[in-house]
Amino acid sequence: MMYFDWNEEKNKQIKAERNVGFEDFVQAFNDDKILEIIAHFNKEKYPTQKLFIVELNEYIHYVPFVRDNEKYFLKNIIPSRKLHKLYKKDL
């Protein structure tokens, strides 16, 4: 069974800056709130990363991640005005 992992220091930083954390993402994932999984915008710089698109705190965020055979390693949680406009019109 796949599980989620992340850097705890990065999680603290994200919580302080954006008032959302990886635990919030995991809850959204478990509640089937993932809107889409897409390739990373910058495939040259991040060829092994993909992005979860998810609504957290009523705003669309993307969560870069790397997947291996046993886990998803979450890299960041980034609010996106562009994705918010794209996805919120459909929600």
Please identify what each model-predicted range represents.
Residues M1-L91:
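Ribonuclease/tRNase effector modules and their secretory precursors
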